[in-house]
Amino acid sequence: MTFPEHLLKLRKGRGLKQTELAPFIGISWRAYQTYERGEREPQMSTLIALADFYGLSLDELVCRDWPKGAEE
C-alpha cells in the first residue's frame, strides 16, 4: 500500500472528510488533499501530527516495511 492510499484508508476508517481532518493536524484541507493524491509529501511536523492523531508510530503511518530480522 502506498502512503497516499494509507492516508485515505485511515481517514475513511474514521469516517472523516478531508475538511474535518485537516484542522486537527494544523493544515488546510487543500494541502491535505495533495498528500492523499500523492502530489506532495508532508513535512515532518505534519507527519508527527498525523501519527499522533491516529495513534500510530511514524513507521506505521508511512507504511515502512522493516527487513526480515531487523527487529532482533
Language model feature labels by segment:
Residues 3-5, 29, 44-47:
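Short alpha-helical elements of helix-turn-helix
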Residues 1, 12-13, 41, 52:
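Short amphipathic helical patch at the helix-1/turn junction of helix-turn-helix
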Residues 26-41:
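Recognition helix of helix-turn-helix/homeodomain-like DNA-binding domains
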Residues 13, 34, 52, 62-72:
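Short, charged recognition helix plus adjacent turn
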Residues 26, 45-60:
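DNA major-groove recognition helix of helix-turn-helix/homeodomain DNA-binding modules
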Residues 5-24, 49:
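Short basic helix-loop element that most often maps to the first helix and adjoining turn
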Residues 7, 21-22, 32-35, 61:
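Conserved hydrophobic/aromatic packing and binding residues within compact polymer-binding modules
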Residues 39-49, 68:
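Short, basic-rich loop-to-helix N-cap that marks the start of a DNA-contacting helix
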